Amino acid sequence: MQVLHVCSEMFPLLKTGGLADVIGALPAAQIADGVDARVLLPAFPDIRRGVTDAQVVSRRDTFAGHITLLFGHYNGVGIYLIDAPHLYDRPGSPYHDTNLFAYTDNVLRFALLGWVGAEMASGLDPFWRPDVVHAHDWHAGLAPAYLAARGRPAKSVFTVHNLAYQGMFYAHHMNDIQLPWSFFNIHGLEFNGQISFLKAGLYYADHITAVSPTYAREITEPQFAYGMEGLLQQRHREGRLSGVLNGVDEKIWSPETDLLLASRYTRDTLEDKAENKSQLQIAMGLKVDDKVPLFAVVSRLTSQKGLDLVLEALPGLLEQGGQLALLGAGDPVLQEGFLAAAAEYPGQVGVQIGYHEAFSHRIMGGADVILVPSRFEPCGLTQLYGLKYGTLPLVRRTGGLADTVSDCSLENLADGVASGFVFEDSNAWSLLRAIRRAFVLWSRPSLWRFVQRQAMAMDFSWQVAAKSYRELYYRLK
């Protein structure tokens, strides 16, 4: 079984979001599971530099100009690169310029990505041809459409990492991207009078996956579907929509081997976690005290992530004696709010604006509770890292958060399945009730330790996801 992942970023070469983490880990897990998985990426500068052994496979003149297809390896995974400097050799973000305006030729840049993905199934590399083209998010959404236009030389899977990003372009670009005008149709890639790369993936793929079972259900509902609910409800009825949970890359995220921690630990040596907490308290300007629960946030600061609720609930958290350490950037209003809280509550609130991968490990290793109060969350990786590190997740019941964290209710504690704290409604009062439950559990150290050990024993490895995808691919054949 030969599978080509078509996508726009891959950790650690280039990362703007969780998609990169998936592509950085899933193909390697699939190879270990017996699937010949490779990855197709645009040759953005950071990616091109990282694949040092790239060799020329093919040269083509395309609707988007001349391209060279390269093939090399990264961390044992075969990587195809679309080398088109006029499209991809730009500094900074792969999607927008330094003023945060989307590149005006994005329609060509990402249509080309889908086109090359489909061409791979038609023999662009004469020595390797995929049985399944697995496209990810809107950037790769045209790959299933180009496959459909070619009579489907391979099966296709389209994975929705976040339905909010739709890749919308003016209709006249149909003249530029070498797809039949008949595809510009409500039963096709047309959406509200425009081309939607996302809808192309949803409509033309043989199967759609979302990054958690709950998110797969949620995106059939109007409040989560961004206008795609009719199509997604139809795919659900046809059995062509399912959810596969993302995993944790245990080579990078494991408290037992994490060199970024002051003190490494396992579920059997949880007392060694305390050193990480005191080091984190020092680094964040908090009072060093192992008796108070340290809550943490590692997130983009947006209302989607529910960080306004944290700001609103913060006085209640601090009144009960807790501390907050926050690492993140985003909405200027939220940034200012958290910085003001740090100034108002010195020693209790520590804030670092920005994102530093290394420091996020130190927070995960040192905090007691990781807050993930998202309004929606397709899968979420932060809560999985929390479980792995014995840093109990406090989450809202949505998307992948609902699938991965079990509340410390009396029933769940008795049944041995409790792993964190879960609240229902997206408001500060509901969040504060969950925070209160965290304080109650914290007051019983042996029970807290029991839940930590339970959380750390859960298996969210990529091997589980790789097996689910392999079974899906074989069902499509």
Curated annotation (Swiss-Prot):
Give this protein's Gene Ontology molecular function annotations: alpha-1,4-glucan glucosyltransferase (ADP-glucose donor) activity; alpha-1,4-glucan glucosyltransferase (UDP-glucose donor) activity
What residues does ADP-alpha-D-glucose bind to?
A: 15
Q: Record's CDD domains? A: GT5_Glycogen_synthase_DULL1-like
Spell out the SUPFAM superfamilies in the cross-references. UDP-Glycosyltransferase/glycogen phosphorylase
- Please, which domain of life does this record's source organism belong to? Bacteria
> Which chain positions lie within coiled-coil regions?
none
Cited PANTHER family: ALPHA AMYLASE DOMAIN-CONTAINING PROTEIN, GRANULE-BOUND STARCH SYNTHASE 1, CHLOROPLASTIC/AMYLOPLASTIC
Any one GO BP annotation for this protein: glycogen biosynthetic process
Into which family does the record put it?
Belongs to the glycosyltransferase 1 family. Bacterial/plant glycogen synthase subfamily.
Role according to the record = Synthesizes alpha-1,4-glucan chains using ADP-glucose.
Mind telling me which GO cellular component terms the entry cites? cytosol
Q: Which chemical reaction does it catalyze?
A: [(1->4)-alpha-D-glucosyl](n) + ADP-alpha-D-glucose = [(1->4)-alpha-D-glucosyl](n+1) + ADP + H(+)
Quick one: which pathway?
Glycan biosynthesis; glycogen biosynthesis
Q: Which Pfam families match?
A: Glyco_transf_5 (PF08323), Glycos_transf_1 (PF00534)
Q: What is this protein called?
A: Glycogen synthase
Show the Gene3D superfamilies listed in the entry.
Glycogen Phosphorylase B
- EC code(s) of this entry: 2.4.1.21
User: Could you say which enzyme class this protein belongs to?
Assistant: transferase
Q: Which UniProt keywords apply?
A: Glycogen biosynthesis, Glycosyltransferase, Transferase
